[in-house]
Amino acid sequence: KTYLVTIPAHKFLHIRNYESIGYWDFWQRQSQIPGQDCETICGLLESIKGKLDDLGGKEANSGSGQVMAFINAPEGRICSWGIPLAEAYGARLPADYQGEIPPQMRLMDVPEGEYIVFEHGPFDYETENQAVEEKIEAAMKSFDFSAVGYCLDTTAGRVFYFYHDCTRYWK
């Protein structure tokens, strides 16, 4: 399903990569940077209190408040939509967050914004993950923004979040 939501202003604590293409490539590249491998970053994010999307999940995914994201970035790689971006992994935090920032991570302010959500319900990770990813990507690529009176925001710093928890959804 596709729907619109307003996401309030918040902060995004994350690491980013300007060359990676997808989740596995992202973590492979990050593992080459001291202190930025998956286990270290997920552990640091797990220790952060007050994550906006933390539902108390035990796995390093959207249920525990950890999300993958694209950030519009002029110095990033050109994605399949023709937009330069960086891939990022992190957690959304309250706009007034004053806690610790691990030295290998970045904290950015994200203004309130209208977001289009492309959502797929629960699925079997082992047998359906690739097909679900392809469906979400196809829906995003073919979406007619003019039909809802919007256009794709390519402003530098704009964030696209990806919530992946196969027991609930991919959006």
Predicted regions and their residues:
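A solvent-exposed interaction/effector surface
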Residues: K1-K171
